[in-house]
């Protein structure tokens, strides 16, 4: 019988696209809404569906992951980068280079299709040129 050793910590971190650790988020002034995630990882290449009823926090969670908002506690790493540790300008650049999101309240180019609207920020990101 063969046993396989778990990958070294560095290898596991490189395989991780998203790592959420001990996140706690509350909207200011709203004690009834809270997102708490103790631990959650998504590997590179893994697909994920975020499904829930209206008001359950899906858009808020995406805003935390892509750095539009920051949590009061915890850590979110995307491709090994701690999102909250970045300045607001650095988060904006990182989001433009690594994310394609259309939220509920969106501004689309009316002459472009959905894919072109999602990909537009990538064409404006310096790292993509």
Each predicted region: which residue ranges?
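Short hydrophobic beta-strand immediately N-terminal to the Walker A/P-loop
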Residues: 48-50, 62
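Short coil-to-helix segment of the ABC ATPase nucleotide-binding domain corresponding to the Q-loop/switch region
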Residues: 112-121
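Helix-to-loop junction immediately C-terminal to a conserved catalytic motif
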Residues: 66
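A short, flexible loop at the N-terminus of ABC-type nucleotide-binding domains that lies
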Residues: 11-17, 25-38, 88
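Conserved ABC transporter NBD signature motif
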Residues: 74-82
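Walker A (P-loop) phosphate-binding loop of ABC-type ATPase nucleotide-binding domains
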Residues: 53-56
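ABC ATPase NBD coupling module
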Residues: 83-100
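Short coil-to-helix "N-cap" segments within the ABC nucleotide-binding domain's helical subdomain
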Residues: 89, 116, 125-129
């Amino acid at each position: 019988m063969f046993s396989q050793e778990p990958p070294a910590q560095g290898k596991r971190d490189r395989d991780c696209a998203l790592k959420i650790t001990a996140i706690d988020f509350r909207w200011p002034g709203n004690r009834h809404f809270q997102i708490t995630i103790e631990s959650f990882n998504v590997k590179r290449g893994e697909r994920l569906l975020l499904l829930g009823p209206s008001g359950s926090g899906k858009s808020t969670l995406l805003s935390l992951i892509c750095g539009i908002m920051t949590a009061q506690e915890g850590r979110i790493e995307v491709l090994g980068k701690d999102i909250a540790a970045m300045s607001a300008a650095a988060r904006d650049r990182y989001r433009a280079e690594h994310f394609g999101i259309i939220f509920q309240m969106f501004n689309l180019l009316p002459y472009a299709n959905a894919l072109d609207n999602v990909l537009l920020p990538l064409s404006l990101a310096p790292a993509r040129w």
